[in-house]
């Protein structure tokens, strides 16, 4: 007869800091941990060996850890009511921000579409896409709600006019590493005076032009996946996986901006702020376009005057919840980026309905 295996505090043989197996580890069906979840339980083999986790209070107050740099935090669904921006009854589109997305090289209309639609679905008031001319027809059909402005070559004055128009800027998705893309990124980073999200090829260009790091501001958000992060910080993906918190916090100390380091467990941080560890989302989201959706969501939240650090944490959490909603419908194999877009509306519809009901009670 198989026994039910219960671990106390953390399964023997697991690192409480990293989740690594230290030789041989106990595989539990349940783990009863004391006071607070250990950070290592969220990573590595620990996710498989902890089993169902129960946190038992032993009288330790969270305030004991105030000010400690090695303490992280997470969100759960109940936090949404305090995180989502209010929607005023008498609002117009101008209240929710003008987004400029500099995205999509020739043939990469999909990246532009996913970013722009995600910004709209997350609540942005108006989205303008600045993209290669070859993408214009596709985007006008895919997303008629967006303003489509195009380029055939780099035009500095035109770009500066668009940057002046916008309340928030997102750049990088599907942008390529072309000379035109490099000029677009360089001018944006040097000239933008608004919150700015930099993703994908924007990060790859940034990693090769270290002088641009000096131009990053506290209003910028960088959203690298692990390979892009390796290019930015100079450590291999293997090193980042093995000592993610050390190298993540080391990188945060080099920039004034927010960093969203994307992985199965995404980290969000800013120098001097606690690190957020995301626990929403699932393996079905490992598909092309999912990162473009996240970039658009974060930009859409910035447009609603959410501060960059909070826009990063909330955007990542909502993105994961949208992926969880998509997985329930499509399973672990068949989820596409477009399904994650549908999941955004599902998550926010459920939450807004609850908010309306609370207001009426």
Each language-model region and where it sits:
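Small-residue (G/A/S/T)-rich helix-start motifs and N-terminal tracts that mark the onset
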Residues: 41-196, 204-221, 226-361
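Internal gly/pro-rich beta-alpha loop/helix module
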Residues: 1-70
């Amino acid at each position: 007869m198989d026994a039910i295996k219960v671990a106390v505090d953390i399964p023997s043989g697991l690192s409480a800091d990293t989740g690594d197996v230290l030789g041989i580890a106990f595989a539990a069906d349940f783990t009863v941990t004391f006071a607070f979840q250990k950070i290592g339980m969220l990573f590595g083999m620990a996710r498989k060996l902890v089993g169902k986790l129960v946190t038992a209070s032993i009288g330790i107050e969270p305030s004991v850890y105030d000010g400690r740099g090695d303490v992280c935090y997470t969100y759960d669904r109940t936090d949404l009511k305090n995180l989502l921006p209010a929607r005023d009854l008498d609002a117009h589109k101008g209240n929710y921000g003008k987004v400029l997305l500099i995205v999509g090289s020739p043939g990469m209309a999909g990246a532009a579409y996913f970013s722009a639609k995600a910004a709209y679905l997350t609540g942005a008031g108006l989205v303008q896409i600045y993209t290669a001319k070859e993408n214009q027809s596709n985007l006008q059909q895919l997303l008629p709600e967006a303003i489509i402005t195009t380029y055939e070559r780099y035009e500095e004055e035109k770009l500066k006019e668009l940057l002046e128009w916008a309340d928030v800027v997102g750049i990088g998705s599907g942008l390529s590493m072309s000379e035109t893309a490099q000029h677009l990124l360089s001018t944006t980073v040097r000239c933008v005076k608004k919150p700015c999200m930099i993703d994908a090829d924007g990060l790859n260009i940034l990693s090769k032009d270290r002088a641009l790091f000096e131009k990053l501001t506290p209003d910028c958000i960088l959203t690298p996946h692990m390979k892009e992060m390796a290019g930015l910080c100079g450590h291999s993906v293997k090193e980042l996986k093995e000592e993610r918190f050390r190298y993540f916090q080391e990188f945060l100390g080099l920039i004034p901006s927010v960093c969203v380091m994307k992985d199965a467990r995404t980290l969000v941080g800013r120098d001097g702020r606690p690190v957020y560890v995301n626990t929403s989302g699932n393996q079905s989201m490992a598909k092309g376009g999912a990162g473009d959706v996240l970039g658009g969501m974060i930009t859409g939240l910035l447009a609603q005057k959410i501060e960059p650090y909070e826009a990063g944490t909330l955007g990542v959490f909502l993105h994961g919840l949208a992926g969880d909603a998509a997985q329930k419908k499509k399973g672990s194999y068949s989820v596409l980026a477009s399904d994650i877009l549908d999941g955004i509306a599902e998550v926010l519809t459920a939450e807004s309905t609850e908010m309306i009901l609370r207001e009426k009670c």
